């Protein structure tokens, strides 16, 4: 008799994706972040669902409903902080996952990579809309500033912004539609994750050497299920430590003040995981130029497979590219720091230099390093 997991139509799909899936025998812990992202998504949907049961998307009551969740709902504060800090964990895993893809040349699987970029944009949009929902000062002004960027689009900009707002300013209509989309998008993300996995399983996983591993595969279960559980334990330990000991460490104190359209906070800034893009936006004095740079800072990932000049896929044996990669990582940390600083000397010039370096490394220096390394191999 055939094992049910191999014969049942539904179990067969699960079996071929998570149990009997042939995986390279040498993939490192950098390959753990895919499963961690799946767990983060499940956690966000679950905590978000319970929060939505108590939240009201009305400008008069939104702030108070969040306070009510923290004070009066059983373990409401745990739900709220798990959801808020879970988003931070989500983005940490997301950025490390993309970094892994860049380092080991996983972007050569173009379909998987491109779906991943669309996923990144969707997750960023979802997180932005979620940040608006508590209706604190930073929620309101963040929504005003970021949606206002669309007014830089020639001809249709102003109409587009007012259409998104549902009026002439960020108000009740904006909050209601942001809540609706914030609730809907995670389910769309879940569907896109399945497409992401579908494309990945067409080609199989990459590995640290960048060399095809078809002749040396091992079953996903038990080897990588155990490995993923270890990653999960480490991540959950970090998340719970954050939630239970300093839940507001990554938040903005201004968001504990109810939204007031008549009082602008001294420094309007997004959550920490958007600061690098915000720094790039601010580094260009022109509004439209800044918006284009902001979009291109993420969209530049699309052209990376076409800028791959090296004969080797992975950076494991390419010291010059490795130096540039870690310079890029340091540059992104610098941009994140700059994004949280006020717009004054010397932060302005540091931000501008870091922004130029960011695009230069990706578009010019990395392809050049690949060509140089090809020549070095001939020697």
UniProtKB/Swiss-Prot annotation:
One of its GO terms (cellular component) is respiratory chain complex III. It is found in: Mitochondrion inner membrane. The lineage of its organism: Eukaryota, Metazoa, Chordata, Craniata, Vertebrata. The chain crosses the membrane at residues 33-53, 77-98, 113-133, 178-198, 226-246, 288-308, 320-340, 347-367. A ubiquinone binds at residue 201. Its cofactor is heme b. Belongs to the cytochrome b family. GO terms for biological process: mitochondrial electron transport, ubiquinol to cytochrome c. It is a multi-pass membrane protein. Heme b b566 binds at residues 97, 196. This is Cytochrome b. The cytochrome bc1 complex contains 11 subunits: 3 respiratory subunits (MT-CYB, CYC1 and UQCRFS1), 2 core proteins (UQCRC1 and UQCRC2) and 6 low-molecular weight proteins (UQCRH/QCR6, UQCRB/QCR7, UQCRQ/QCR8, UQCR10/QCR9, UQCR11/QCR10 and a cleavage product of UQCRFS1). This cytochrome bc1 complex then forms a dimer. Its main location: mitochondrion. It comes from Murina leucogaster (Greater tube-nosed bat). PROSITE patterns: CYTB_CTER, CYTB_NTER. It comes from the Eukaryota. Heme 1 (or BL or b562) is low-potential and absorbs at about 562 nm, and heme 2 (or BH or b566) is high-potential and absorbs at about 566 nm. Component of the ubiquinol-cytochrome c reductase complex (complex III or cytochrome b-c1 complex) that is part of the mitochondrial respiratory chain. The b-c1 complex mediates electron transfer from ubiquinol to cytochrome c. Contributes to the generation of a proton gradient across the mitochondrial membrane that is then used for ATP synthesis. GO terms for molecular function: metal ion binding; ubiquinol-cytochrome-c reductase activity. Binds 2 heme b groups non-covalently. Heme b b562 binds at residues 83, 182. The keyword Membrane applies. Keywords: Electron transport, Heme, Iron, Membrane, Metal-binding, Mitochondrion, Mitochondrion inner membrane, Respiratory chain, Transmembrane, Transmembrane helix, Transport, Ubiquinone.
């Amino acid at each position: 008799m055939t094992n049910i997991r191999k014969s049942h139509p539904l179990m067969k799909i699960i079996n071929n994706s998570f149990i009997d899936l042939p995986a390279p025998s040498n993939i490192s812990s950098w390959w753990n972040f895919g499963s961690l992202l799946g767990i983060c998504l499940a956690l966000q949907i679950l905590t978000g669902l319970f929060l939505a049961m108590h939240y009201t998307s009305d400008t008069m009551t939104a702030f108070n409903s969040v306070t009510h969740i923290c004070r009066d709902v059983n373990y409401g504060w745990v739900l709220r902080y798990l959801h808020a800090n879970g988003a931070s964990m989500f983005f940490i895993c997301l950025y490390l996952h993309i970094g892994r893809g860049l380092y080991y040349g996983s972007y050569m699987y173009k379909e998987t990579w491109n779906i991943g970029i669309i996923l990144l944009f969707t997750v960023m949009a979802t997180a932005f809309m979620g940040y608006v929902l508590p209706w604190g000062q930073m929620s309101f002004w963040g929504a005003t500033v970021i949606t206002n960027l669309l007014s830089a689009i020639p001809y249709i900009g102003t109409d587009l912004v007012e259409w998104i707002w549902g009026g002439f300013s960020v108000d009740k209509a904006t909050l209601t539609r942001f809540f609706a989309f914030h609730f809907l998008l995670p389910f769309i993300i879940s569907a896109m994750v399945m497409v992401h996995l579908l494309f990945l399983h067409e080609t199989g996983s990459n590995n640290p050497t960048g060399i095809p591993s078809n002749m040396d595969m091992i079953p996903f279960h038990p080897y990588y299920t155990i490995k993923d559980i270890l990653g999960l334990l480490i991540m959950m330990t970090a998340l719970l430590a954050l939630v239970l000991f300093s839940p507001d460490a990554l938040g903005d104190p201004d968001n504990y003040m109810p939204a007031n359209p008549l009082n602008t906070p001294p420094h309007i800034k997004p959550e920490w995981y958007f600061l690098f893009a915000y720094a790039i936006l601010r580094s260009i004095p022109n509004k439209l130029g800044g918006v284009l740079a902001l979009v291109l800072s993420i969209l530049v990932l699309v052209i990376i497979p076409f800028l791959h000049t090296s004969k080797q896929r992975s950076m494991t044996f390419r010291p010059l590219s490795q130096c540039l990669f870690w310079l890029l990582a340091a540059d992104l940390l610098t941009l994140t720091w700059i994004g949280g600083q006020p717009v004054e000397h010397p932060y302005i010039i540091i931000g501008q230099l870091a922004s130029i370096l960011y695009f230069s490394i990706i578009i010019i220096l990395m392809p050049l390093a690949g060509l140089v390394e090809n020549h070095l191999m001939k020697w």
